[in-house]
UniProtKB/Swiss-Prot annotation:
It comes from African swine fever virus (strain Badajoz 1971 Vero-adapted) (Ba71V). Induction: Expressed in the late phase of the viral replicative cycle. InterPro entries: DNA_clamp_sf. Belongs to the asfivirus E301R family. Keywords: Host-virus interaction, Inhibition of host innate immune response by virus, Inhibition of host IRF3 by virus, Inhibition of host RLR pathway by virus, Late protein, Viral immunoevasion. This is Uncharacterized protein E301R. The keyword Cytoplasm does not apply. The keyword Calcium does not apply.
Length: 301
């Protein structure tokens, strides 16, 4: 049977031509003279996924910090146990300009509705904040196939800063991250399954590792009832690394409800998990130019 007969009637699907966007990074001057902020990026779906994450965590208000080098989104989850800090470095996008350091406050539900209407036909997002309209943030989405631009004007405010939330940024500084004694990677599916299964039996789980080349352990034990032990024997399978001295044991107890809600909210396939001695956890994931950090405090147990 010939190839044409196997394919059946009708035209072959039209191949989409994707423009080649240059990533120029940080600009010294804006393209639009009135701009205080200009952000142009050829991956709008990254923003859609970020706001899906905020929605899944039931975040309410989002702080946006613009600096001459990067744009950062800060928020809390509904339980107030987890803090989200998502950063895009200006040098990794098509073009980026911010005149100085300033903050904007946006309502998550309002922006989320806008991103819900964005699909793969839009190949570029441009965000603009202008001196002459300080109460407005412009979102411009471009569909190059039919040369269409969709512009949304979202009302923003000069927010009251959540200093406890902003202070959490110190937990993910480059210097601080080097000193976390334990880190490993899970897929979002692994993370969700492990903590969903555990939640059927217990409220707390112990994370434990001996110093040296030893397995990672997750377990719980209820007196005269039930116990469970999960062991990861091959460190390379989960990219397990630690700085725990050979003679020591690293052990923390974690509230499962906090992790379960995060696991259900995740929008990336791979998650890096870092543990502090005080039991605080950091969940890191990357989406192209976006670095997403979620810090969960153990002292909320």
């Amino acid at each position: 049977m010939s190839e044409d007969i196997r394919r059946g009637p009708g035209r072959p699907p039209k191949k989409r031509v994707v423009p080649n966007f240059e990533r120029k990074g940080i600009l010294e001057k804006p393209v639009r003279p009135q701009s205080r902020l200009e952000f142009s990026y050829d991956n709008p779906l990254i923003f859609k996924n970020l706001f899906i994450y905020f929605k899944n965590l039931k975040s309410k208000n989002i702080l946006v910090r613009c600096t001459p080098t990067e744009i950062t989104f800060f928020s809390r989850d509904q339980s107030q146990a987890s803090f989200v800090i998502a950063t895009i470095d200006g040098k990794n996008v098509n073009h980026y300009y911010a005149s100085d350091v300033f903050w904007l406050g946006i309502n998550r539900e309002l922006v989320e509705k806008m991103f819900n209407s964005i699909d793969r036909s839009f190949l570029k997002i441009t965000i603009v904040h202008r001196y002459d309209k300080p109460e407005t943030l412009f979102f411009i989405f471009t569909d190059f196939d039919i040369d269409k631009e969709c512009t949304y004007q979202i009302t923003v405010s000069e927010p009251e800063l959540d200093m406890d939330l902003i202070e959490m940024e110190k937990s993910i500084s480059e210097e601080r991250l080097k000193n976390y004694p334990l880190r490993w990677e899970f897929t979002s599916k692994q993370l969700k399954k492990t903590f969903s299964d555990l939640s059927n039996y217990t409220e707390l789980v112990t994370i434990e590792k001996l110093g040296g080349d030893t397995p990672l352990h997750l377990y719980f034990q209820k007196f005269n009832s039930i116990s469970y032990h999960e062991m990861y024997k091959s460190s390379n399978k989960i990219n397990l690394t630690s700085t725990i001295p050979k003679s020591q044991v690293f052990q923390i107890n974690v509230k499962i409800a906090h992790i379960k809600s995060l696991a259900s909210a995740m929008v990336t396939d791979k998650i890096r998990i870092l543990c502090e001695e005080n039991g605080n956890l950091i969940f890191q994931s990357e989406m192209d130019a976006l670095m997403l950090n979620t810090i969960t405090l153990n002292n909320t147990i």
